[in-house]
Amino acid sequence: MSKISSKISSVDQEKFQAFLQQILRNVKTQEDPRVLDAYRRLFRKSVPFSMRSYVAAHLAHTHCRAGATAGSTRRTGAREGIRTGSAHAPSCASAPASAARARDFERKARDYPALCPGDTTSIFISIGKNRHIYPRDIIALLMQRADVAREHIGTIRILDHYSFIQVLSGEAEAVIARLNGLFYRGRTLTVSHSRRADEHPAPSTEPHAAAVAPEPDFMAEPIPALEE
């Protein structure tokens, strides 16, 4: 039996791991990256580096226990209600608020109209669907690593090996400088101005090379819905 198992029962381990997986899903699909980044910076400023993992574990443990206690209280209350005849059948109105937040974030992520073509530049980034990248990931990457405001991110087109992002022309160079060479999702990113289709780039054996990636027609395609 491992040291971890000797301190935590197998049932509690499973519950805690499930809780952490739910937290990861929430971070990827529900939370506003700007809010998370603000808390992340405050956390790093307030907690010494050597203690961060312990503080994070304590927060997760406390939150997990609080959730289990609340769930037990709700179940007990439901049983009491059944015995007294005051219980109500579950309804859609009692769905978790987190689901509503997730829908709201996804709506915001896809409902911004395309930026005016005359003021924008198409950026090529060497990562795509084969790395399980979705529009929300691109948005978070630009906001957190390149300090781009959400309303300055236009149409996003994600292909198998690379993606195209519409950004304001005045911010394009800064985005390229901050993201090019960044290690992300297991690879080093190549970020550059995307070529237009009429430039006839030289062929390449690399399917995701920037040289073979013509700029898409942003006006012809709407902003894609977030994929699950």
Curated annotation (Swiss-Prot):
Source species, domain of life: Bacteria
Chain residue ranges for the region called Disordered: 194-228
Protein name, per record: Uncharacterized protein TP_1029
